[in-house]
Amino acid sequence: MSEPIKLHDLRPAKGANKPKTRVGRGEASKGKTAGRGTKGTKARKQVSAAFEGGQMPIHMRLPKLKGFKNPNKVTYQVVNVADLQKHFENGGNVTIADLVSAGLVRAKQPVKVLGDGEITASVNITATKFSASAKQKIEAAGGSVTETK
């Protein structure tokens, strides 16, 4: 009975691993044109991957983008009055820290309260910004709004 094959005994089959042919190293071994054929751009240099063979390139066919990206754009996290009703139905004072602990917003980012939904709880809320409808609904429910910077 022969011994089992072990990992360190494995070798590639004879002729399976051929050395890479080094071209352009003399006339006898793929010298001169080195497998590139004769003449033309591809024989002389590397053609750019973006080259489309004389067709108008894609970056020139597409329209230019208008406008710019405003570096001073402020993106607000949104909280609706329906969320306030759901999480703070007893009313009271609500700050951004309370909204963070309730899982409605993330810390260190501005918060805007919008007027989607209904609110009956009397909340005194402090946030970065309020929409006009949110202010109206909160004040109609007996609460107050305070805008921070």
Swiss-Prot record:
One of its GO terms (biological process) is translation. The keyword DNA-binding does not apply. GO terms for cellular component: cytosolic large ribosomal subunit. Keywords: Ribonucleoprotein, Ribosomal protein, RNA-binding, rRNA-binding. GO terms for molecular function: rRNA binding; structural constituent of ribosome. Residues 1-12 have a biased composition (Basic and acidic residues). HAMAP family: Ribosomal_uL15. Belongs to the universal ribosomal protein uL15 family. Binds to the 23S rRNA. PANTHER family: 50S RIBOSOMAL PROTEIN L15, LARGE RIBOSOMAL SUBUNIT PROTEIN UL15M. This is Large ribosomal subunit protein uL15.
